[in-house]
Amino acid sequence: MSTSKNEYYDMTRGQKTCFVFSNSTYRSKKDEITLRKTFIEAGYKVRVIKDTNLIKTTNILSEFSEFAKKKKVCAVIVFILSHGVVNGEVYVGSDRCNLNYMVNAMDTEILRGVPKMLFVQINKEYRSVYENFKDVIVKFMSNTNLATLPDTTVVSIEDPCPAHAEYKPASPDVPLDFYYRESWYTNQSKDVTRVGSPMIQELCKLLRIDAEFCEIMALLDKKLEKFHIEP
C-alpha cells in the first residue's frame, strides 16, 4: 500500500477524539459506558456530554474545532445516543437537531481533511439495520485513501411502514472527509438499558478483542470480516 502523504491521511499521530452525546432520561447508559471504555482503550480522548441542547451542542463542537489545531487532532468520531426523531430531526439531549448543524460545526478550515464520523443510534424502537458500515469502519480506521471511500449512504428499512419511517433522520449533507451512519430499533421486547444497542455493543466488542495486543487499525481489518447483525 502506498504511503504517499498526498494520498493517505496519517491517523497514527496526533490526538483522536470521541464525543458521546447522551441523556439521563432514556435508555443510553449501557452504550454510553461501553463507548467510553472502548475508545479510551483505543487511544481516543473521550468526552461524554449529557442533557445538552441544540445551542450548547453546536457550541461544543465549534469550540473543539477552534482548538483542534493546537491539539493536533487527527480523527474525530461523534456518537449521538438519541431517543427519537421528529420531522427528520434527531433528539440530541433535550432538543431536536438538524444534523446539518452538527456537520457544519465541524466542517471548519482547521479540521478540513481530518477524518470525521457522525454515528446516530436511535433507541425509540429496537432493530439494528446498517449499510456498508463494515467497509467504512475498516477504511476509516486503517489510513485508507480517502478518495476510495464509498459515497455516504444512510441506513434504510426495507418496505418501511409509516411508523418506522417516522423515526428515520434526514440525511445531512456531508463533505468528502465526513462519514455518516445511523442505526435504530423496532422491537420493544429487548431491554437496551441492560444489554445496550446491538450495533454499538458489537462494534465495541470487536474493537476490544485484541486491543491490548495490537493496533486498532490492524485489529479491525482482521475482525470486521465477520461483522454482521441480524435484524
From Swiss-Prot:
Belongs to the peptidase C14A family. This is Caspase-like protein. GO terms for molecular function: cysteine-type endopeptidase activity. InterPro entries: Caspase-like_dom_sf (IPR029030), Pept_C14 (IPR002398), Pept_C14_caspase (IPR011600), Pept_C14_p20 (IPR001309). GO terms for biological process: positive regulation of neuron apoptotic process; proteolysis. It comes from the Viruses. PROSITE patterns: CASPASE_P20 (PS50208). Signal peptide: none annotated. SUPFAM superfamilies: Caspase-like. It comes from Trichoplusia ni ascovirus 2c.
